[in-house]
Amino acid sequence: MQEAGIDEFAAGGGHVEPAAEVDPAAALKAELRSKPGDWYVIHSYAGYENKVKANLETRVQNLDVGDCIFQVEVPTEEVTEIKNGQRRLVNRKVLPGYILVRMDLTDDSWAAVRNTPGVTGFVGATSRPSALALDDVVKFLLPSGSAKKDAKGAVSTAAAAEAGGLERSIIEVDYEVGESVTVMDGPFATLPATISEVNAEQQKLKVLVSIFGRETPVELTFSQVSKI
């Protein structure tokens, strides 16, 4: 009977149904839910996020609090940047000035984080910080994976255009410094923002978005915002 089953499978061309596509956000959320601890946001100085991450990871080892501080992340996304006419892929921080920490909140873990050089405090109540919702954690951590595909596509399109295979489109700059816009894409979608800088060559804007009650500069493309 087993041989007959194999013959029938071969006769049918050995067709196997393709696996269903997995939603990256749902998969990441399930993975995060299975891990211990809650996610908290700590504030630092913009530009020092990676240094603070390294400082905290060193303190976790030195203070032997690895049983309550499990993971430290500086969320990044891969984007295409145009500089001097050349396109290149760069890692950009999703939350400038902020670091995510997965931990069990205890007196020891709180003190280890709060007294780390470069940390200016937890986001939330001073005595008892609030954990970040899992959906928000997914929103901040997921762009690093999804942005890579977009960035690669942008590079391919640029190469094709330079080879004459595509006609470069001209995008009219219709944004001004001080103008209010709505973020349409990415982790800050639906939030209002104020334009602080316009880069016509790279087709990007620097906007101020209120993140955790504080105005934070975020870099976005023209297509990621909409006029109010």
Curated annotation (Swiss-Prot):
Decide whether keyword Transcription regulation is in the record. Answer: yes
Chain segments annotated as transmembrane:
none
What GO CC terms are in its UniProt record?
cytosol
User: One Pfam family this chain carries?
Assistant: NusG
Q: Tell me if Zinc is a UniProt keyword of this record.
A: no
Alphabetic keyword roster: Transcription, Transcription antitermination, Transcription regulation, Transcription termination
* Domain of life where this protein originates: Bacteria
Cleavable signal peptide: none
Q: What biological process terms from GO does the record include?
A: DNA-templated transcription termination; regulation of DNA-templated transcription elongation; transcription antitermination; transcription elongation-coupled chromatin remodeling
**Function according to Swiss-Prot or TrEMBL:** Participates in transcription elongation, termination and antitermination.
The entry sums up its family as follows: Belongs to the NusG family.
Q: Which PANTHER family match?
A: RHO-INTERACTING TRANSCRIPTION TERMINATION FACTOR NUSG, TRANSCRIPTION TERMINATION_ANTITERMINATION PROTEIN NUSG
Query: What is this protein identified as?
Result: Transcription termination/antitermination protein NusG
Q: Which organism is it from?
A: Mycobacterium leprae (strain TN)
Q: Which lineage is the organism of this entry classified under, starting from the top rank?
A: Bacteria, Bacillati, Actinomycetota, Actinomycetes, Mycobacteriales
The gene name on file is nusG
